[in-house]
Amino acid sequence: MSFLWSFASFIIVISVLVAVHEYGHFWAARKCGIQVHRFSIGFGKVLWSRTDKQGTEFVISAIPLGGYVKMLDGRNEVVPPELSSRAFDQKSVLQRAFVIAAGPIANFLFAILAYFTIYTVGIPTVKPVIADISSNSIAAQAQIEPNTQIMAVDGTKVSDWETINMLLATKMGNDEIHLTLSPFGSSIEQHKVLNTKDWRFDPEKESAMSSLGLQPVRTKVDMILSKVEVNSPADKAGLKAGDRIYAGEQLISWQQFVQFVQEGKPFNVKVERDGQFSFVVLTPELNKKGRWYVGIAPTAAPISDIYRTELKYGILEALQKGVEKTIQLSWLTIKVIGKLFTGDLALKNLGGPISIAKGAGISSEIGLIYYLGFMALISVNLGIMNLFPLPVLDGGHLVFLAAEAVRGKPLSERIQNLSYRIGAAILMALMGFALFNDFLRL
């Protein structure tokens, strides 16, 4: 995946979602009779502009990392008496709150529309069937059996591994997780309880489900090497593409092999090449990301059709599913943010623009429907983040308006300005920390 592809995919995501967000503010302002001076996508030098009959200038600027809607406002300019009724600051608290909240609401509506489209067209996925259970894991202690399908997590129905993984991640810090299971192909329900009191995991190194010992049905892996990286530990040991790897007399599984590598210690493997057998010692090394690796890729076969499914519904059900998915993602986002503040999830998991760019590039390469799903996810995150009660964000403005409604008058300009400075400092610190984490992951 090229840098340019990821960058272009990222710019499209940000530009579309910013346009959606700002259009929410713009539409609400027009509905409330507020004069809008400018609707801008991006910052900096103006690349294109057009002014409509109502005097609003629509602008595309050079730096596509944000946007804004500039409204007539007596706090920032001298308003002619004949236009005072069209100034933002002269509108009622309820009208101003509507204009401010309309941005995040537009992001949520976009997510609903995106998921409605996805579920109408149909999106291929893999049924959440457990292929194997890692030994000595939390799932093993709960006596969960392979070849069972996860039907619900703490009562929330699930139909794919992506949703399960996100749900499990939000359970960090909980003492227990309740799973509803069914033997694959059966309607008989089983209920298992995962003891997660001491459960912790690093999302950079493993998924929530794998850290619990749940191994999903994956592409079938044959331990015939399809690739050996140049100058990798495997290359130094003499391994070549086409070699078949064994552990003693038993054919090693990819999961077992990964466990050996992650221990970071030298281990012996038996190698078959052109009908001849030999033994080599593989010594894992740390890569740039601080992970143990040996530099090989196995041969992969497609997942059996019996485990494949397509999430596709009629128009009304697709709309319902779109609403449910958006609500679910919103709640999951809030819970994850909460766990970042409580320490249940480390702040190093906070991602910034580089992480978004990577996700945009990967999803766009997989297919348009997955790219749309990624945009919906980021749109939900954008909506939630903008509702944070920081003065520089929409949520902070809503807090000021709530205070005005209670007091009968706005907070003093001094308090508001001080709050803006503090909010801006906090936001810049979070953005800087997220960007720092992004660079560490490169």
Curated annotation (Swiss-Prot):
The UniProt record lists the keyword Zinc: yes
TM stretches of this protein: 97-119, 366-388, 418-440
Stored Pfam families: PDZ, Peptidase_M50
The enzyme's E.C. designation: 3.4.24.-
GO annotation terms (biological process): proteolysis
Zinc listed as a keyword: yes
Entry protein name: Putative zinc metalloprotease PM1991
